Amino acid sequence: MPENPNSSKAGNLTRCKQLLTYFNTISANFEIDFVSSINWRTGDEAIFQSEFPNINLIILPFKSSKKNRISYFFRDKLQKEIKNIFHSNLIDRVSPSFQRRFEKILSDHKYDYVIISYVEFGSLVKNLIGSYTILDSHDFLTLQNKTKEKENFSMRQLGKMFGAELSMMTSFNEIWTFSIEEKYIFEQFADKFVRLIPVSMPSPVIQEREKKIDLIYVASDNPHNVSSIKWFLEQVFPLLAHVELHVIGKICAHIPTVKNVIKHGLVDDLAAYYEQAKVAICPMLSGTGIKIKVLEALSFGIPVVTNQRGVDGLFNKLDNGCLISLDEQAFASHIIELLQEDEFYKIKSNQAIEYMRNNHTVKKEYEVLDAVFNNR
């Protein structure tokens, strides 16, 4: 996993920590190494080891040391430029230097299983023999880029990217996804075993607090969230008189000062805010895969008002605690109904709790993972 899992509360890192928690529990049967590259600051290693004492942390920077400038130029920078010129790939993000240093780790340890996060780093195992390799896909990258760069991608480029993504996938023994839609796509085209991993949410011990927060929105600052919250504030929020919106996460940096919008930034205890929230919003005009923040809110029994893309990846599209809105009027109407109609609110809240209990418990996720690693 490239990023320090404690560097933010983004959904991909939340899920990474859930997997690390599982691996930490099976250390009696396995010696486990976690290789990561970026966003590690002083003191972060100690925090990681206190959380996951049974996992060996290996920090491997993307770039090699620059202490010897001549060596760095010839062994890192120049080789990267040559690869970009003669072996360009729309998917591959691995430099020759990083490939070489990662393969040394593989050679030194002789792993039974190797799990790579993100298809962009799939080439790290292209020369590996003898290990069972797993791609933890996280996202359908071609679709992610299409929605992010839709004005700049031709159908020809998208076709080439899709081909490159599938080619990278075929070098693995199996592929993990947590989206029901992406499972179907990968199974049809990748010709590899695709395993649906349920994203688990620990059942929170909910402190009974006064519901002082009308609306809560928790998000990172990825481009999909930035454009979606802009739409919400411009098109939906003006339709909600006397309603307060509390915003949490890096997305706050992209939100202007607006009446009745309270920006909290990054917070230490997210549960304390969920416990006080009546309704969660997830405006989502584009994007791929399951939305971890939707699952987080549902796990607290909080109904979620969202767009069609907000329920992508969910195993059940109906009676799950989410209200899907096709336009700004419907989005505002759903919020008002939840805030004003107690019986309707209770129904949607109970649906959220039931959906999470049936599909996203830690027990269900561990059962699937145990089947992978024969940990029974």
Please place each PLM-identified region on the residue numbering.
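Acidic donor-binding loop of glycosyltransferase active sites
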Residues: 275-289, 300-303
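N-terminal subdomain of nucleotide-sugar transferases
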Residues: 1-58, 107-109
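Conserved catalytic-core segment of nucleotide-activated headgroup transferases in glycan assembly
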Residues: 15, 162, 176, 196-263, ...
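Short hydrophobic beta-strand element within catalytic cores of glycosyltransferases
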Residues: 293-296, 303-307
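A charged, aromatic-enriched C-terminal amphipathic alpha-helix characteristic of glycosyltransferases
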Residues: 343-374
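Membrane-proximal helix-turn-helix segments that form the acceptor-binding/catalytic region
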Residues: 21-22, 97-104, 135, 141-142, ...
